Amino acid sequence: MVWFYIALVVILILLLICLILAISIHNKYFFNRFVADSLTRYYTKDEFGLSEHVVSFSCNKRKLKGAFYSKNIEYPNNLIIFCHGMWSSRKAYMQDIAYYCQNGFEVFSYDAYGVDESEGNSIVGLGMGLKALDSAINYVKSIDAYKDKNIIVIGHSWGGFCALNIVKYHPNIKKVIALAPFISINQVLKGMLPKKLGFMAYFITIIDFFKCGFYSLENAKKNLKKYNGDAYIIHSLDDNMVNYNLNTGLLKKNLPNYSNILIETVNNKIHNPQYTENAVKLLNEYLAKLHSLDLTKQKELKSQTNFHDLGELDLDKIEKFILK
């Protein structure tokens, strides 16, 4: 009997150590704000001649900043909601937003909680991204001019996770498009952690749950089974940020006979399947050079780099899916 209690104490100590380590890892990545680098020359709305109507809406008792973008609206019954990825803001996706606007759509995009122009002392956790999207859709639906429009949600990476799982909270969304998405927080963490520490993904997800609520536990593998709208997922097999096999590959195995879910794989696009191969190549060369420099020279490189070539788009297939 004594050995039983000794074993129990040892197990509890190990669990406590794992939780403390999980808190430390979670805080390292999410217990801070993200502000867009002022030296990075992103595309701007003015370059594309877009109109911009800036708004704010509530999420977790804070104000998130977003905007409605348009050019020549040809599809007035549709609204695209665009969700940015991790460690970026809507500024980094202005070329994507402009593409849809130039093709006749109105787009609403926003900075997530704790990101750039939005309030929030920190990002809080990955689950907060889904909560922010939930709040954004509720806000849009509260506006008389938009409440009856068909909503199409597009997201990249973290935004892709949000796009796939928001269907649980808003099942009437017409379409969702996910670019290099992770299907759950647990799965993306498994891919990012060293293999021997993969079990820590469960503990970090628990910490995310305590901070963000049930949004942190959502899994597209389950939620897409109940979704009657159309879903399109595009993911590069060589993605080094969101592991394909642990996310989209797993989804493909579990949802093989769902005619409303289209999964497409590409290669040589790494974590940006919406970019041309040349843009991805240039981006990787830039990042490799950037990481080899000290801080002073990094600033010089950023100020001298034309980021437009690094973000050239390849969105023809996505546009066809939206219009079908």
Regions found by a protein language model. Give the residues of each.
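Short alpha-helix in the alpha/beta-hydrolase fold that links the catalytic acid
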Residues: N243-K253, A279
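Conserved alpha/beta-hydrolase
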Residues: I97-E119
